[in-house]
Each structure stands twice: as structure tokens, then as C-alpha cells.
Amino acid sequence: MVLASLSTGVIARIMHGEVVDAPVLQILAIKKINSAADSERYRILISDGKYFNSYAMLASQLNVMQHNGELEEFTIVQLDKYVTSLVGKDGAGKRVLIISELTVVNPGAEVKSKIGEPVTYENAAKQDLAPKPAVTSNSKPIAKKEPSHNNNNNIVMNSSINSGMTHPISSLSPYQNKWVIKARVTSKSGIRTWSNARGEGKLFSMDLMDESGEIRATAFKEQCDKFYDLIQVDSVYYISKCQLKPANKQYSSLNNAYEMTFSGETVVQLCEDTDDDPIPEIKYNLVPISDVSGMENKAAVDTIGICKEVGELQSFVARTTNKEFKKRDITLVDMSNSAISLTLWGDDAVNFDGHVQPVILVKGTRINEFNGGKSLSLGGGSIMKINPDIPEAHKLRGWFDNGGGDSVANMVSARTGGGSFSTEWMTLKDARARNLGSGDKPDYFQCKAVVHIVKQENAFYRACPQSDCNKKVVDEGNDQFRCEKCNALFPNFKYRLLINMSIGDWTSNRWVSSFNEVGEQLLGHTSQEVGEALENDPAKAEQIFSALNFTSHIFKLRCKNEVYGDMTRNKLTVQSVAPINHKEYNKHLLKELQELTGIGSSN
């Protein structure tokens, strides 16, 4: 067994600001420290054989090495990436060594003892601190920049900012007053507004990333107006003088115990030269459109495609908030000969120009499942790039311009409406005979059927009034309703429909369930009207429900076996309903007759 030699005396040089490449050190102790938020942090005692430093921290991404027992006492490690940061009021406190990447050279079980008799680096002799030839390192200080002159206050750095060395995101905590981070914007939300009893306002949020980690930042009201147009996704900025507080994990899934809030003193400057201290690029895990059909509902996905079709801008008003929303559906195609619908919202929908059929790259877009197909929706944490300068985009452009998008074989997104028969046509008896729904994933089919019976009992429930929540509320009395999901009390609620009915075709009858939107379409009334009638006007409710009896429709059905207690039931759910398009339906019947009789089609 050969033990690596420690980089003797190097700790004193590092802690006094010198850049040293890949120092080899020994871990003498490691201890979990208390954190003000729900996050693990580890402090280590580290030695170079001559000096030790008790103010060293592991970045959170290295916690797994501690959990796996790789960083035991006496382990010899090589520091691959690290930074030093001043912690304390006005930057006058202790300098902390933060390690973001390391390599285990010799496990502690091999070393078995402390190497040398190290003393604190603060006792280092002056000769140990003499300048040494610097080598390239990942912890290079940022050169101080001349202040820029701009009429927008706080948009650029000024003389009050100590830009001599940036701080890693992983080192930030509410106990620091002076710091500057250099970070890339990985995502940026649209402007969101709110209005309640305490007032009204607006906000937007962004996710920031450097080599050490990531953090969420939010700008409210005046800061929202000041910084929204300045901040651009994928650009790198110096940012300072934000407020730090424990992260609200209900709204952020980032691996950081804290989040930032912009204040009136916040300073932001675009970093135009990132060569000296590179910030990681945004990474894309691009998935072919054809693969999206096999992915889970609500999963996030990165993909790239050509915008082949652009839908009209649509506006609608939320019933509960009376807030207007705008959206636009576009169709993307790619070299897997597949197409998928992507929904844009807000300003993205209003400003989108697809007449030149650009390349569209999306990151973190959400998969929605509807009518047996999959579509994409650009959410607040998603990124959309138009004609990105990457090899995949250039290759896709060449494919499309040479006729590649002319024959798309696979439409991943479901088509809606009474005239579409892309889903397999089947009778209710055939669906049962073929044992649909018994696999791991649900099956889908459609049929023409008549409504026989509609149950009024339990046809609705009281739901959370928030536009993005449909959870059932609990009546607390005194006109107060609690939503467990939102963990909030509301003075009102909204009705949601859950209708069970018996439908039949010429082969069989089945009980099916339909949810809110389908129920409203079938009954011809809003859920609010139906709920109020069921609770307050039984005669009107009877009229609404009886009008549905003995009406025929095209039903698109989802079929899946579900377990209730120790019993398995085959459940049918109405995914969509449409009036009968007799011309299209007759075409289907003629095709069935031709297949049954073997008679070819005639003109």
C-alpha cells in the first residue's frame, strides 16, 4: 500500500487567497452541523500535514459521499474544485473553505492515523505565505471591474460592492451581509399578479446556478418592474445585496436550504466575460418526440422540434378568479417522424411568431395526458429557446428544409372532436372480451353509445376555490372551508362534478364515470349551476339530469383495472364526448362492412 504525499503547507496559502491546483489533504474529523433550514451541512477538520483548517465545509452535493462512508477519519483526498468565502458581519469574519468536488486518494481504513503534527494555519510563518507561481484552478478570483455608468440605479455594480472575489451559491446564508455571486439564469417565470385582503402586487422568480449549486430568487412589486426585462435566461450576472431566508419547499424543488428575495438595494450586473471563471452551461437531456408517448403524465421533459403549425391565440377567463388567461397551441415535429402539441401561455403565447417555422427547444416542459395522447405545456419553470445555436438544431433545420416534415407518421397528441377516429373503434362487448385495462397502462377506445341512467347521488363535491387546485375541502363551520393540500381556510368553494352513468351500445351496457369538464358538456350546464341545483332546487336538478337520458354520443373511454380492497374492478372513465358526426360515422360503418364481407370499396 502506497500513501499519497500531502501538499505540505498549502492550507495557509489557500486560506490567504492563493490559487492552488488539486491540493492533496487529509480529513481529520467530520461533523454534521445544525442548520437554520431543513438541510444537511458537514464541517470538516482538514490537514496538509503542517497546518490544519477547522473552517472547511462540504458542498451539499458531496453529502452522499459522507452517507456512503467514503469520507471517514484519516482519509486522504484531492480537492478538485473549491472556493474560499468570508463569513461574518461586513465580510470581516472567518474565511471558510468550501469544497464542491474531491477525489478519495486513500481511504481512512488504509491510512489509519494522522499524518504529521499540524497546527492552525493562522500560525503560519511569513515564508510559507510568500507568493508561489499560480496555476489554473477552479477557484480563481474575479478581477475587479470598473463601475459602469447607467441611469438605472442598482442595475450595475458600483463602488459599494466588493467584487474582489465572488461567493459560491452553496456558501450563502442569512448570516452574511456582504457577498457577490456570479451565476447563470437557468429559468425565469412570467410576471404573476395577486390580489387579496392585504393588497395586490406582482412578482417573478428565477433559478440561478453556479459550479457549487443553485438557488431560487424572487423579485416583488417595484423590483419586479426594475429587473424583469434585464434578466434573461442563460445569461450570467453578478448579483449582490439580496435578502436570504429559508426556502419554501412548497414552491421550489431546488437543492438549497435558502432562497433569495430582491430588495431596493439589490445590485445586478451582466457578466460579459465568463472565460476566466466559467459558469456551467445549461444542460439539455433532449428526448425524441416519439419517446414522449411512453413517458409518465406530469413528468418534465426536454425536447426539440420544428414548429410546423401555429394555432390561434385563445383567451379565457377563470371562473373562480375572473382572471384572463391567454394560450396558444403549436405543433412540433422532429426526425422521429412524430408530432406533438405544445401549449404556450401568457406573453409567450401572445408574442410567438411561427410563420417562418423556427426550431423550438424546450426544457422542463410538462407532459399532459388527455384522450389517450400526450401533449406538452410550457410552465413557469420551463425554458423555451427559438432557433438555438446548437448542433441538434442545425441538423433538424436541414432535415425539415429538405422535406423531412412532409410525412409525419405518428401524432403523439390526441386529436379531439367528433370527426376523429384515430383511437381504435370498439363495441363495449369487444372491450370486455379483449380484457382491456388489464395491463400496466390504461387502454383507450371509442364507441357510439346511448345514455340510459344518470345518478344524481354524489354527483358533485366541494373543491378548493383556487384555480390550480381541485382538492376536496372540509367544512369547518362558520362558512369556513379548509383545503388540506393548500393548508388554507377559504370563505367559499367551487363545485366539481363526478358523474356516474350507464351507457349502452347494441352489444352491451357499462357503468362509466365522467369528471368535471365532460360532465358540464354532457349536462349542458356549469358545475356551479349543477351543484347549486342539487343542493337547493331538486326539481331543477331532476330536469337537468333527465334531459341527458336516451341521448347518443361518441364516447372516448379510458379502461383500467383498479383495486378496491381485495377486489379488482374494470373501470371505464369518459375522456371526451362529442356529438355524432353522421358522415364520418357512416364512413366507419362502411369500412367495417367491407372488412366483414371482403368486398372492396367502390367509387
From Swiss-Prot:
Regions recorded as binding DNA: 179-252
Subcellular location: Nucleus
Keyword Repeat attributed: no
Annotated GO biological process: DNA replication; DNA-templated DNA replication; double-strand break repair via homologous recombination; meiotic cell cycle; nucleotide-excision repair; telomere maintenance via telomerase
CDD domains noted in UniProt: RPA1_DBD_A, RPA1_DBD_B, RPA1_DBD_C, RPA1N
Alphabetical UniProt keywords: DNA replication, DNA-binding, Metal-binding, Nucleus, Phosphoprotein, Zinc, Zinc-finger
Gene3D superfamilies recorded: Nucleic acid-binding proteins (2.40.50.140)
Residues modified as Phosphoserine: 160, 420
Zinc fingers classed as C4-type: ranges: 464-486
Region annotation Disordered: where it falls in the sequence: 131-152
GO molecular function list: damaged DNA binding; single-stranded DNA binding; single-stranded telomeric DNA binding; zinc ion binding
GO CC annotation terms, alphabetical: DNA replication factor A complex; nucleus
Main localization of the protein described in the UniProt heading: nucleus
Subunit annotation: Component of the heterotrimeric canonical replication protein A complex (RPA).
Cited function: As part of the heterotrimeric replication protein A complex (RPA/RP-A), binds and stabilizes single-stranded DNA intermediates, that form during DNA replication or upon DNA stress. It prevents their reannealing and in parallel, recruits and activates different proteins and complexes involved in DNA metabolism. Thereby, it plays an essential role both in DNA replication and the cellular response to DNA damage.
Annotated family: Belongs to the replication factor A protein 1 family.
The protein's name: Replication protein A 70 kDa DNA-binding subunit
Species: Drosophila melanogaster (Fruit fly)
